[in-house]
Amino acid sequence: MSLVFDKWELDEVKVEDMGLAKYICLDSILVPHTMGRHVKRQFAKSKVSIVERLINKVMRTERNSGKKNKAYKIVQEAFEIINRRTKENPVQILVKAVENTSPREETTRIKYGGIGYQVAVDISPQRRVDLSLGFITRGAMQAAFKNKKSIEECLANEIMLAAEYDTRSFAIQKKEEKERIARSAH
């Protein structure tokens, strides 16, 4: 049995949101790096480990663009901080944060006769997970920018706040904003 970062088991991690269960991959993997084998098939990224998807989202930001090893170390240290503070499996905390920050509705623009309307639509589970991971990493990057706190601390803090559904979390704020806009478009 392999462990994430050679420390945490994925067997004990549970996904409570049944809509996301199929899209949050918890396969055992020692080093979360698949070298982009999933990009050629449409829904193959749902088979990529949730930890690797978080690493890829951290890597996509301006400062860490293309630096997979740096992003790997950021996520690994953030997981260490989460484990020290909560004494729980950090992958379970991450899964809880993804469940809490994934929006269920958003708006899309539809044109009828040259006039554009905003219409509320349900979000697919794949997009919900993508948006959630994006909100978490963007919140961590914004918290770490021009701040004494390291990116690792900010990422750990953002994940823990999101897992507790704390409104101080950037990801929770963005989720609620997206759902509020969708409700007003009904």
UniProtKB/Swiss-Prot annotation:
InterPro entries: Ribosomal_uS7, Ribosomal_uS7_arc, Ribosomal_uS7_CS, Ribosomal_uS7_dom, Ribosomal_uS7_dom_sf, Ribosomal_uS7_euk/arc. Pfam families: Ribosomal_S7 (PF00177). Gene3D superfamilies: Ribosomal protein S7 domain. GO terms for biological process: translation. The keyword Nucleotide-binding does not apply. GO terms for cellular component: small ribosomal subunit. Transmembrane segments: none annotated. Keywords: Ribonucleoprotein, Ribosomal protein, RNA-binding, rRNA-binding. GO terms for molecular function: rRNA binding; structural constituent of ribosome. The keyword Protein biosynthesis does not apply. It comes from the Archaea. Belongs to the universal ribosomal protein uS7 family. Part of the 30S ribosomal subunit. One of the primary rRNA binding proteins, it binds directly to 16S rRNA where it nucleates assembly of the head domain of the 30S subunit. Is located at the subunit interface close to the decoding center. This is Small ribosomal subunit protein uS7. It comes from Methanothermobacter thermautotrophicus (strain ATCC 29096 / DSM 1053 / JCM 10044 / NBRC 100330 / Delta H).
